[in-house]
Amino acid sequence: MVFYGENGPFEYGNEGATELPIFHPASDDKTKVIWLCSIYPYSIMDSLNEAREVGFKDLDGNNHEWDRVGQIENYTQIDSYGYLVHQWTKYVKFGAQRVADIACRLAREGVLTRDQAILLTNTNDHLCDPKAKRDFCHSLGITEEFFDNVVEKHVNKDVIDKDIDGNWKRKDLFKNSRK
């Protein structure tokens, strides 16, 4: 079985990458191909249900290999813990990350109400999953303290500030800014 989809962090900028044939010429295996990308009207839930029908396992249910922090679903970007750090860095630069993206999609599809999407976004969007952060730092050979110092230097302080607990949050989401 072959799943096609976009994985931007790995598909772009791979200098020296070699394109290989996806079918072995001598193979007589039957291959089922499912395209899960920019189809319209695109439905994240339809894609999830179609993938589940052919054996996809998400992180829900009895698969407690990872209880993600700062996410509102357990079926996207689950191949690598570190993926989520990329998403989280959007938050400290722009004030929104993957939670907002998914909440908007689910609201458009009628899975969430607008109020539910806003609440989930405001509650989770600022959180960086600690397991993802550890994995990301380990992959780069840096300490979490070094990572935090880099974030501190590049955070968009027009939009983001630390709350009283030291968490980066959008300024409009808390009353007592450090200022």
Go through the PLM ranges and name each one:
Residues M1-K179:
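Nucleotide-activated chemistry modules centered on ATP-dependent adenylation/adenylyltransferase
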